[in-house]
A protein has these predicted regions:
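Edge-of-domain interaction segments
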Residues: 1-72
Length: 72
């Protein structure tokens, strides 16, 4: 099996807004970050480490529960 380098994202955290992404917590703020899926596991996916601006980055705090499609 190949080795994939990426950011592990729980499937239940994934939302669809302007493409596929997740909400992340920035202090008190909630922000939407796109993900660039490079591998699909059972209950998670891996997002590219170097996808660029507007995409999930390694140290982002992913919100898994309690956020609806509008970020509330």
């Amino acid at each position: 099996s190949g080795e994939y380098e990426g950011i592990k994202v729980p499937r239940k955290a994934i939302r669809f807004q302007d493409g596929k992404g997740v909400y992340v917590k920035l202090g008190e703020r909630i922000s939407f970050k796109k993900i660039d899926v490079i591998y699909e596991g059972g209950d998670y996916v891996l997002s590219s480490l170097n996808a660029g601006d507007g995409y999930l980055s390694l140290y982002d705090d992913i919100v898994v529960e309690g956020v609806d499609a509008n970020g509330n």
